[in-house]
Amino acid sequence: MRIRYVTLVGLLVTLPLYADPAQPVDQLLAAAQARTEIPVRYDGSYRRIGYPGGDVPADVGVCTDLVIRSYRALGIDLQQRVHEDMRADFAAYPALWGMSRPDSNIDHRRVPNLESYFRRHGQTLATHRNPDEYQAGDLVTWRLPGNLPHIGIVARERSADGQRPLIFHNIGAGPQLEDMLFDFPISGHFRYGLEASP
C-alpha cells in the first residue's frame, strides 16, 4: 500500500512538469513577447493589404497590430474574423469613420472595432481597478488623453512592487512590456480565444 501511495504522490508532483507547454495563453504571451524584440515604427496609416492573413510591413504597426500579430500564433486571424462579423452585422460596429461598408484593409486595426468584436465573441469582464481581476492573456482597452483608443495584452510578469500585471502594448515607441495597467481610464476588459477558438 505504501508503494502505491508513494507512486501516486510522485505522479501528482511530477505531472505539472509534463503539462502541455503550448497552451493558447502561453502561445499568445510568447508571441507578444517576441513582438517586443522587433523594432517597429508607429504608423497607423491606411494601407492596402492582402486578405485573409494580410498585414502591414513588419517594421510598422500600432497597438492593434501587436494584438493581431500575437493572435496569429494561435491560428486566429482577427482581420478575417472582424471583417466577416462586420459583413454579417455592420450596424453592430461603431460608425466613427464615415464608412458605409466593411473594409478588410483597416477595420481590424481600429480599437473600437476590436472592442465590438470581443464584446460579441469573447468574454466581457469587469473593468475595476483590482489588479487581481486581470489574468495573463486578457485584453484591455483604454482611452488615452484626447479620447484616443488603445489596446494591450495582460502579461504574467508583475510590476516592480508585485501589485499589478505588466502589459504588452505599443503606445508609440514600438511594442513594449510595461507597468501601465491603471495609467489611463480602462474602457474594456476581454478574454478571447484562450480556451478554444470560437
Language model segments and positions:
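Low-complexity, Gly/Ser/Thr/Pro-rich intrinsically disordered linker/tail segments
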Residues: 162-198
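N-terminal hydrophobic or amphipathic helices/low-complexity stretches enriched
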Residues: 20-41
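...with weaker cross-activation on analogous glycine-rich loops/strands in unrelated enzymes
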Residues: 24, 29, 87-168
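Sec-exported extracytoplasmic/periplasmic mature domains
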Residues: 33, 37, 68-76, 83, ...
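Bacterial N-terminal signal peptides that target proteins for export
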Residues: 1-7
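Second-shell loop/turn segments in exported
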Residues: 21, 49-58, 100-104, 125-129, ...
